[in-house]
Amino acid sequence: MSGKDQSREITIVGGTYRETCYWPVWDELYGSGWRAVRVIRAFFPDVKIKFHTAGGSDVKQLLKVYAASEKLEYEVTELPDTISFYYNHPLSSPIMHGCPSTMVDMNASGQYVVGFGMLEAQTMINGDWVVYDPQSPRNPLSFREQGGKAAHLALVLNETEARKLSGEMELDAVKTALFEREQCECLIVKCGAKGALVYTSKDDDGKVIPVFKSSHVFPIGSGDVFTTVFAHCWFCGNKPTDAALIASKAAAAYCEERGIVDNIPEQVKDNGYKEHTPLKKGLVYLAGPFFTLDEKLFVSECRNMLQGMGAQVFSPYHDVGEGKAEDVVPKDIEKLRACACVFAIVDGLDSGTLFEVGFAVALGKKVVAYVENETEGALKMLEGTGCDIEKDFTTAVYKTCWYAAE
């Protein structure tokens, strides 16, 4: 990093929420705001932090204990209960509990401010250098319409938030509307597995910032890490594109480690992650049994998650259906020949699925085999023929989408 003094004071505004995931198991008190505090502390230990958040008694106790040993000032707007999010898996839409019926007002000011949209509060931010992430695909709130003031404003949004906030659909129109309405000098639109686009003016065509591949993917909170690291790097005088590149590597390190650990800054500096550069939109063949209700539900979940990541998916269950072998098999084989890669549900060692895997391997296709319960011996042929064997569902989905785009 370069430029200004890195031991500055940063004000962070954002939620502190309970996050519970059933598979893989995750039960932590985090949320965007508190995660940002932890990220700043891990990456930039000399920075003083002022933290504005809201929550119940558990949040107050957490911050009291943490502040006793760290450079942290905090202010908690008290709520009856801390908001909780429950995920079936990291790619699923969470169920939310504890959100108050009315929003509270929160004010925060400072020379350098990282602000996250909050479910329970409208935040009015006043700062010289401000990074704002609305954090709400359903109802993103405008920085300026909340009364926010900033001499230098950067917006970080995903595609859905950018379209909702701007009222436009095409990215060129989105960009123009947000620069004009929000009076920002930098706009970052996160595009999932395709990376992010960084704009520095409404006439800018945008610079693509790649996603970096990790061997394990735990995405809950990765967007918070990206925004926070980008903010500090930008505050330090880095160009927006350079700051976003560092932030993308930091997000990959977080996904790899499944949390904020001491060695994340070293991982980012070592630059051990490969860029994912989408070159095409290849077809994913979804192989798996669909004889019982639970099998049909899981095949549908896999299809939905892959499509949600932007993949084109052929599913024999959804696209051909059940029928006589002479009717369905030729159609399946045709798509196996045409696909870029295969996502295979291997638990249960279904004979049809194993045939599809073997056929794909013989054709030189990439195969990601998602399996939780089978023995190493049962998977020997898959392992020996170069299939990616994954026990983590989210990682399997990400790897499949990466292969499909190569």
Language-model segments: residues:
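TIR-domain catalytic/interaction hotspot
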Residues: G321-A344, G352-E356
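Conserved phosphate-binding/catalytic region of the ribokinase-like
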Residues: G3-R8, A173-K281
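Amphipathic helical hotspot of TIR/SEFIR-family domains
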Residues: G348-A369
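Charged C-terminal helix
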Residues: V65-P80, A252-G308, P316-G321
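Short acidic-hydrophobic, aromatic-tinged amphipathic segments that line or gate anion-handling sites
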Residues: Y74-E78, T385-T400
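Short, glycine/polar-rich helix-capping loops at beta-to-alpha or helix-loop-helix junctions
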Residues: P140-G147, E372-G384
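Conserved N-terminal subdomain of the carbohydrate kinase-like
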Residues: G3-I12, T16-D27, V37-W129, G272-P278
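Conserved phosphate/ATP/ADP-binding segment of small-molecule kinases
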Residues: P134-G206
